[in-house]
């Protein structure tokens, strides 16, 4: 829920998350002590949901994961990862400015991402 530009109110967010990504990086002997090589990323602010599986409302047709922190990213199998957010703080709100967030887990099918080298 974005506030109209240049306004601050209690029923909307004036500073929305714009950048949330899960990166796959190369960890090898070749880059020890140097920069990591980015292999790919998943944009958590633009998650396609063509089968309408999300239990949270879509934003312009996509699921967003706007939380301040991402608590975990785990590989489930060769095609899936789970991304989780533990919203255990009573004043944590990223979806509705006047309501504490639920804990959320997303199971994402990202086989090509996981296979990328």
What are these regions (language model features)?
Residues 1-117:
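Sequence/structural signature of beta-propeller domains
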């Amino acid at each position: 829920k974005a506030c109209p530009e240049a306004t601050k109110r209690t029923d909307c967010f004036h500073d929305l998350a714009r950048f949330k990504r899960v990166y796959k990086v190369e960890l090898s002997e070749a880059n020890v002590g140097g920069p990591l090589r980015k292999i790919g990323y998943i944009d958590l602010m633009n998650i396609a949901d063509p089968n309408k599986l999300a239990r949270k409302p879509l934003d312009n047709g996509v699921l967003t994961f706007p939380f301040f922190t991402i608590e975990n990213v785990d590989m489930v199998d060769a095609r899936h990862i789970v991304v989780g957010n533990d919203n255990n703080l009573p004043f944590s709100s990223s979806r509705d400015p006047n309501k504490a967030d639920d804990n959320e887990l997303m199971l994402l099918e990202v086989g090509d991402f996981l296979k990328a080298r």
